[in-house]
């Protein structure tokens, strides 16, 4: 909770470092379960044995600028550039992940932002963290309820119902989507809407779009 409250005081370029820290503090048991499942599958484990893993490709994401509009790679580039995040500095400053699976999971955080369409707003970060570490688990819902609904009720009680609807939609929208096993590194030039279709993702609801847009760090 300390790191979450500090996020709103950080400069935008420094927030990835804080988010990486939060990712190490939640969902340890579920993280191990997901990791074991990933490594026990020959197809997904092989993704870590490549010369150009997802982490290697993401470390040079500025090359994605040349990709066609609407592709996963171009969407990643535009998202990472939106607040001029220094990706290399954020990773180096954090220093908490090891090579292999852990590095891939670090990059999956940004992939979730892009594929699910969540911004870097307070709500967007909460929804991304919840989706990442408690997919299909009610504890993830409880997390974004705490950081989103409770605070919003204190600031603007009339918006509580909309916030609740958005949180419910986040939970329903991510449940059962096996994004951990999807080879994003092989589909950087594919249209992002096709990827969403392949993952059987529902469209963002109006409630999610509204709350994500209006949920500021101030």
Per-region residue spans from a language model:
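A cross-kingdom marker for long, charged
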Residues: 173-218
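N-terminal mature-domain "stem" immediately C-terminal to a signal peptide or N-terminal signal-anchor/transmembrane
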Residues: 1-10, 20, 28
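Core of folded catalytic or high-affinity ligand/protein-binding domains
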Residues: 14-24, 31-190
């Amino acid at each position: 909770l300390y790191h979450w409250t500090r996020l709103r005081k950080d400069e935008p370029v420094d927030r990835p470092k804080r988010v990486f820290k939060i990712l190490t503090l939640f969902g340890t048991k579920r993280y191990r379960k997901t990791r074991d499942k990933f490594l026990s599958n020959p197809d997904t484990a092989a993704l870590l044995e490549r010369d150009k893993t997802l982490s290697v490709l993401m470390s040079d994401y500025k090359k994605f600028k040349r990709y066609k509009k609407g592709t996963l790679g171009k969407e990643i580039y535009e998202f990472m550039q939106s607040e001029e995040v220094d990706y290399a500095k954020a990773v180096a400053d954090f220093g908490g992940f090891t090579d292999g699976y852990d590095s891939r999971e670090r990059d999956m955080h940004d992939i979730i932002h892009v594929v699910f369409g969540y911004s870097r707003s307070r709500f967007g970060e909460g929804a991304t963290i919840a989706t990442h570490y408690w997919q299909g688990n009610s504890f993830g819902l409880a997390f974004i309820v705490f950081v989103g609904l409770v605070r919003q009720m204190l600031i603007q009680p009339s918006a509580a119902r909309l916030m609740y609807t958005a949180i419910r939609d986040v939970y329903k929208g991510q449940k059962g989507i096996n994004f951990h096993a999807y080879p994003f590194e092989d589909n950087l030039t594919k249209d992002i809407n096709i990827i969403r279709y392949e993952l059987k993702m529902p469209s963002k609801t109006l409630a999610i779009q509204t709350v994500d847009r209006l949920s500021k760090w101030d």
